[in-house]
Design a protein with these regions (language model features):
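Gram-negative bacterial Sec-dependent N-terminal signal peptides
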Residues: 1-22
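Extracellular beta-sheet repeat scaffolds used for adhesion and glycan interaction
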Residues: 118-142
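Charged, amphipathic alpha-helical segments and their flanking helix caps
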Residues: 109-110
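Predominantly extracellular/luminal cell-surface or secreted proteins
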Residues: 90-92, 113-117
């Protein structure tokens, strides 16, 4: 009888093991999603340094009629397909439509103008106003853009000696 039981136990074990070999796989799936939001950014700015402003003309012995120019660069990018990207430039010392550098006295101001591009031949930039900027597009790549600045003789002559400075804040915007 023990022998029959051993054979029966072996048969049951074999049957159980063979059942595993006949198992059926079960599957499930999951979805994967992502989205890209419309967005624009600016950064990586360089300083605009006019340096010493030429006040006197040694050749004529009078006041200089020369303008002073300087440039600054910044990076800007928008996600591909963002609608109507624009930039706004605001002077910390400006008022109305002007960009202004403030002197050490706290009351002396030198007005300057900003332009799109590397020279004052570009489109002038309105103070604190959103506007399109040449070369700035929503194509998903970073653009290195240049702004030119100009101080004309009338805005610097007669100003007291000292250091003048301003901070320009660039705001990137778009139509959602």
């Amino acid at each position: 009888m023990t022998r029959k039981l051993n054979k029966l136990a072996a048969a049951v074990a074999l049957l159980a093991a063979s059942g595993l070999a006949w198992s059926v796989d079960d599957t499930a799936s999951f979805s994967v999603t992502a989205s890209i939001a419309a967005a624009c950014v600016v950064g990586n700015t360089t300083a605009m340094a006019f340096g010493p402003l030429a006040m006197l003309d040694t050749a004529s012995g009078g006041l200089s009629t020369a303008k002073n120019n300087a440039t600054a660069t910044f990076d800007a990018a928008c996600t591909n397909g963002t609608t109507s990207p624009t930039l706004k430039f605001a002077s910390a010392n400006g008022g109305g439509s002007a960009f202004k550098m403030l002197g050490g006295s706290g009351t002396d101001l030198i007005t300057y103008t900003l332009y799109e591009g590397a020279t004052d031949a570009g489109t002038s930039i309105a103070h604190d106003t959103l506007a399109a900027f040449t070369g700035y597009s929503a194509d998903g790549t970073t653009k290195s853009l240049t702004v030119a600045g100009k101080v004309v003789a009338a805005d610097k002559n007669g100003k007291p000696i000292g250091a003048y400075s301003d901070t320009v804040t660039i705001t990137a915007s778009f139509t959602p």
